Amino acid sequence: METFLFTSESVNEGHPDKLCDQISDAVLDACLEQDPDSKVACETCTKTNMVMVFGEITTKATVDYEKIVRDTCRSIGFISDDVGLDADKCKVLVNIEQQSPDIAQGVHGHFTKRPEDIGAGDQGHMFGYATDETPELMPLSHVLATKIGAKLTEVRKNGTCRWLRPNGKTQVTGEYYNDNGAMVPVRVHTVLISTQHDETVTNDEIARDLKEHVIKPIIPEKYLDDKTIFHLNPSGRFVIGGPHGDAGLTGRKIIIDTYGGWGAHGGGAFSGKDPTKVDRSGAYIVRQAAKSVVANGMARRALVQVSYAIGVPEPLSVFVDTYGTGLIPDKEILKIVKESFDFRPGMMTINLDLKRGGNGRFLKTAAYGHFGRDDPDFTWEVVKPLKWDKPQA
């Protein structure tokens, strides 16, 4: 059996770039909660002792941006300079303006357009992907890297590993074989964890705790063997972390947010963007389409692309590739997808209920992935029943 190696990485919520994603989406939640028609394009950047939120926001909501920044930093665990940032003492800069009236007129007709006539907020192309290798219909390498990162945060916050600090990165290399286009995981080849820690812990203790409390509960035994390689804090020391260690910026972890390098990516980030931004809503609808194709048994693996022009409601193109795993031709699957999903931005917003913010809805998406999550707020993960005729054996 000929196999190959494929690697996916993740970062947890204390990584500076992810901190910025979470602040941007916390701002989005706050705006949408009070005004579902808010137009939000909120960026965040951070470095030692400083967080800045900036961008274009048009909303009737009353939003305390500084409070959102401090609350988000605090909830992640940035409560002192020792861990990389002090939520209560850091400088918070705000530079937010209104959305350009040119964009507002072209896209929304200043709110005079019907939902089906609302144009895309920008040009671009987005991809959705699904694969039958996990129950989530997501790539195993990505799922494991993401869940290990989430587990790191869990054992830090519940006190299991008191030496942990907020910043951390994970990476999983899977060994696969190609079953006529479908991806079949054979084993986990390598697990890499680099996590921020305090001064009190030794490298041996770090390795022991990570294996026992983080890796063991997450990676199924069937994927581990005596040849699996573990790199646990291979650099030896990671005390300085968070914004003190590295600058952070919204939208720099787009592969971690999606499919871990599998499928494809159009390049647009998600966090801090309201649903008129097709970078986000378009990527959500094509994930639902790809997932529905696989979940309905039409293919074992699927990639769906959609593209847009600014101000134009109808997509310019829709594309489907099942990598040779389709039970019917891709052109027939494409026809079913186009008949079953409404790719117009205004309709995607309604069908996926994307104007509903608050309760940390979009904040949740900003760490540990936007896809493959079992959460009713992730409406794009709901499988749509598709009508198709299975070929006779």
Swiss-Prot record:
<dbReference type="GO" id="GO:0005524">
    <property type="term" value="F:ATP binding"/>
</dbReference>
<feature type="binding site" description="in other chain">
    <location>
        <position position="99"/>
    </location>
    <ligand>
        <name>L-methionine</name>
    </ligand>
</feature>
<keyword id="KW-0479">Metal-binding</keyword>
<keyword id="KW-0554">One-carbon metabolism</keyword>
<feature type="binding site" description="in other chain">
    <location>
        <begin position="235"/>
        <end position="238"/>
    </location>
    <ligand>
        <name>ATP</name>
    </ligand>
</feature>
<dbReference type="InterPro" id="IPR022629">
    <property type="entry name" value="S-AdoMet_synt_central"/>
</dbReference>
<feature type="binding site" description="in other chain">
    <location>
        <position position="277"/>
    </location>
    <ligand>
        <name>L-methionine</name>
    </ligand>
</feature>
<dbReference type="GO" id="GO:0005737">
    <property type="term" value="C:cytoplasm"/>
</dbReference>
<feature type="binding site" description="in other chain">
    <location>
        <position position="56"/>
    </location>
    <ligand>
        <name>L-methionine</name>
    </ligand>
</feature>
<feature type="binding site">
    <location>
        <position position="273"/>
    </location>
    <ligand>
        <name>ATP</name>
    </ligand>
</feature>
<keyword id="KW-0547">Nucleotide-binding</keyword>
<dbReference type="Pfam" id="PF00438">
    <property type="entry name" value="S-AdoMet_synt_N"/>
</dbReference>
<dbReference type="GO" id="GO:0004478">
    <property type="term" value="F:methionine adenosyltransferase activity"/>
</dbReference>
<feature type="binding site">
    <location>
        <position position="43"/>
    </location>
    <ligand>
        <name>K(+)</name>
    </ligand>
</feature>
<keyword id="KW-0170">Cobalt</keyword>
<dbReference type="GO" id="GO:0046872">
    <property type="term" value="F:metal ion binding"/>
</dbReference>
<dbReference type="InterPro" id="IPR002133">
    <property type="entry name" value="S-AdoMet_synthetase"/>
</dbReference>
<feature type="binding site">
    <location>
        <position position="9"/>
    </location>
    <ligand>
        <name>Mg(2+)</name>
    </ligand>
</feature>
<keyword id="KW-0808">Transferase</keyword>
<dbReference type="InterPro" id="IPR022636">
    <property type="entry name" value="S-AdoMet_synthetase_sfam"/>
</dbReference>
<feature type="binding site">
    <location>
        <position position="277"/>
    </location>
    <ligand>
        <name>ATP</name>
    </ligand>
</feature>
<keyword id="KW-0460">Magnesium</keyword>
<keyword id="KW-0630">Potassium</keyword>
<comment type="pathway">
    <text>Amino-acid biosynthesis; S-adenosyl-L-methionine biosynthesis; S-adenosyl-L-methionine from L-methionine: step 1/1.</text>
</comment>
<keyword id="KW-0067">ATP-binding</keyword>
<feature type="binding site">
    <location>
        <position position="246"/>
    </location>
    <ligand>
        <name>L-methionine</name>
    </ligand>
</feature>
<comment type="subunit">
    <text>Homotetramer.</text>
</comment>
<feature type="binding site" description="in other chain">
    <location>
        <begin position="167"/>
        <end position="169"/>
    </location>
    <ligand>
        <name>ATP</name>
    </ligand>
</feature>
<comment type="function">
    <text>Catalyzes the formation of S-adenosylmethionine from methionine and ATP. The reaction comprises two steps that are both catalyzed by the same enzyme: formation of S-adenosylmethionine (AdoMet) and triphosphate, and subsequent hydrolysis of the triphosphate.</text>
</comment>
<dbReference type="InterPro" id="IPR022628">
    <property type="entry name" value="S-AdoMet_synt_N"/>
</dbReference>
<feature type="binding site" description="in other chain">
    <location>
        <position position="15"/>
    </location>
    <ligand>
        <name>ATP</name>
    </ligand>
</feature>
<keyword id="KW-0963">Cytoplasm</keyword>
<feature type="binding site">
    <location>
        <position position="269"/>
    </location>
    <ligand>
        <name>ATP</name>
    </ligand>
</feature>
<protein>
    <recommendedName>
        <fullName>S-adenosylmethionine synthase 3</fullName>
        <ecNumber>2.5.1.6</ecNumber>
    </recommendedName>
</protein>
<comment type="similarity">
    <text>Belongs to the AdoMet synthase family.</text>
</comment>
<dbReference type="Pfam" id="PF02772">
    <property type="entry name" value="S-AdoMet_synt_M"/>
</dbReference>
<feature type="binding site" description="in other chain">
    <location>
        <position position="246"/>
    </location>
    <ligand>
        <name>ATP</name>
    </ligand>
</feature>
<feature type="binding site" description="in other chain">
    <location>
        <begin position="252"/>
        <end position="253"/>
    </location>
    <ligand>
        <name>ATP</name>
    </ligand>
</feature>
<dbReference type="InterPro" id="IPR022631">
    <property type="entry name" value="ADOMET_SYNTHASE_CS"/>
</dbReference>
<dbReference type="GO" id="GO:0006556">
    <property type="term" value="P:S-adenosylmethionine biosynthetic process"/>
</dbReference>
<dbReference type="Pfam" id="PF02773">
    <property type="entry name" value="S-AdoMet_synt_C"/>
</dbReference>
<dbReference type="GO" id="GO:0006730">
    <property type="term" value="P:one-carbon metabolic process"/>
</dbReference>
